């Protein structure tokens, strides 16, 4: 935490230091509004949801990686 708010020249940084805000995790909006950057808040909704498993997909290794695929017992190559 910052405790040397008298040595800071900018009034915005004085305000940050006065409230003992850690400048490493805070940014200042140009209009003078304090925005706290929290990594937990920046996680998108898609990242919060668990990954869904594929329904009816191929079991085992990915066949497209090896250049062949099996359809109803018949192997096709593409």
From Swiss-Prot:
**Disulfide-bond pairs as recorded:** none
| InterPro entries in the cross-refs | SDHF4
Sequence similarity? Belongs to the SDHAF4 family.
- Name of protein: UPF0369 protein RF_1112
Q: What is the lineage of its organism?
A: Bacteria, Pseudomonadati, Pseudomonadota, Alphaproteobacteria, Rickettsiales
